[in-house]
């Protein structure tokens, strides 16, 4: 190139061009790409006045306007990317930067829109104000109870007839489209309304569309003339029926969360009952157990009415010695039947308190735990059990491996944030094995903790409900623990839960037997059905292959009718769940969670349905390390198999599209879209199986807390604790912190009105941020540190409120990125024999994605004007 440019260009220009070529090469561009980049630059200088101030401004904003194009490392087709992105910018900015006269022309519409939103926000309060007199006045109060029941029965019967007509009425495509547009319009209007009314309306609309869909599937979409199509269609219909049942039961379960608040205790402490705290342990490390014991010693409860027990099923001498040193009671069994349930039942023989509180050995209670929960027991004498959330201060495998800790609600947030609150409305709260209080009298009546299944907690609450006792749930986190450290451990835990719930379904079916209310039966059945999702999920992941590979019509209907029934069913369900579950489960994430577990929970649940006594109990390991990033090939093997199977479907689908009958082209397209969606979800499952590093033995907890540090010369610095762990803290100094580097300082923390001092060493200094390492502590200092940090009453209360609201489209984009990330990991960690295949595929997808236009990043100077415009 140098010879040609030296001949064509003057020396100064040639020198600059050679310098640019070398710069391209230095940033990793190939010789061909660098040469072509220089050629494009010459053409740009010839035809575009790049020296003009306007073009100079565009070049200065290159990183914001063209975020996906690296100007220092050109690629051969960058001009095409520039062209597509420029067109996108012109179209996008033309909508946003509307001239002022035009804005005024549409100001009337903007005012109407603003008034509409204001009216929708004020509507619930207006309705409440207009109808508050009805709370005191009963319109049918003058009638007898029998007459009121008759009127209610007539209304319900009439409503059911209307619903049946609405669901079963056949429509032609145009009528179906108009009907769906009406429902969709109502949904878009209602979803913006705050309060429970909008959620109830969305549930009604979703059920209407979904019931029409399932009716249509049963009556119009099975091919009875082709055995292969019939069998495949029935298999898919089975999975869809399961999903529809779970959808309906799920709506019922969370239709009106109770959101129970604490009841104050009597001022006379002599009326407070005695409580035994049980901490069962088997093979956990003593360092894991210490924190819960130290925190329990500081619980705000009369010391003469509080007994703490270590239930050691491992019979370890170091645990016995530790219990003796800190002044708690210790029990070790000589036999170990029935695992955790047997361990607790053995301790019940020795404990004599009126109530028993159970904690897994990694759950650390706050000091307010008993004061927040015990008031309800004194108010309601039939209350047998109070459950609080299982909160985790360490990331679970999904959060850690995907880098989503405290950015996206984790897998358990939906259950403890919404489902249990919904169960509480129907008096169907489940005992979850930890972070709960149980009244001894009902527990003794049912013979202690249930031992017939491996999920002894849920079975115990079922037995209490059968006896006529009530349960309660308080959504305020009052304890926190360690999440599972690896995906394999997480899956093992879920396998045990799935097998146990199916065992209960077989051995003590909530649909049969005495003692349960109808609503309780439905809530228990839905919980058990949830763990039967393995087989239906696998069916959904392979269903489109039936047509592509076997030419089986699993939905025997025109593609237009499939779109008119399937898409509204999915969209309404997604919209409704986004409204109800927004803070607790973001859209499309259930697909990832269920896909990861599907292959592994399907066999044990099927075995438990056939033989409920088969299987064994396994203990979930906590507190482990992951020293190097790696792909868990054993866990990911099923996902990779499904990926390869779907890729075969893609290849066959492409062949069918070009060489198959023209009448099937639209059906092939629909099937291919389904396959690509499955590939995205499977890619997400693969991404989860890449274990990220976890080299900290002590997990850091983010928290803002005032504190102070004192140097050895007595000089004090006020500071704010930003995070803490069992081994140190991160603080922010009000001022320069460089003078503290390497020094030994005392950390001052407050608990109530009392101040505690802890010796620390400054481990790092970055600006005004300081990392402190705890020096060796005495037992009493360790107790005080745990009670000043982990056991503070307000430590976990606001964590659930930190999650952003669900935005379905953004969530879908996250899932797309997650799926692509999974395939990149396969290319990175795959064996050398197949690494080339994955690398080619991911490179091809990355190359295609590189042409997609991006939304430009906003500059700092543009933000105030945009905000001002929004306020105007």
Task: Indicate residue ranges for each PLM-predicted region.
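N-terminal membrane-anchoring/stem segments of glycan-assembly enzymes
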Residues: 2-271, 523, 533-537, 659-689, ...
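Long helical/loop segments within the catalytic core of UDP-sugar-dependent glycosyltransferases
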Residues: 253, 331-355, 367-454, 465-466, ...
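Structured alpha-helical
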Residues: 7-8, 13-15, 25, 629-872
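Short, acidic, metal-binding catalytic loop of nucleotide-sugar glycosyltransferases
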Residues: 294-305
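Cell-envelope/extracellular polymer assembly enzymes that use nucleotide-activated donors
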Residues: 274-276, 307, 459
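A conserved acidic beta->alpha catalytic loop
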Residues: 312-319, 335-336
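The conserved acidic donor/metal-binding loop of glycosyltransferases
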Residues: 360-364
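Catalytic donor-sugar/metal-binding loop of nucleotide-sugar-dependent glycosyltransferases
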Residues: 463-479
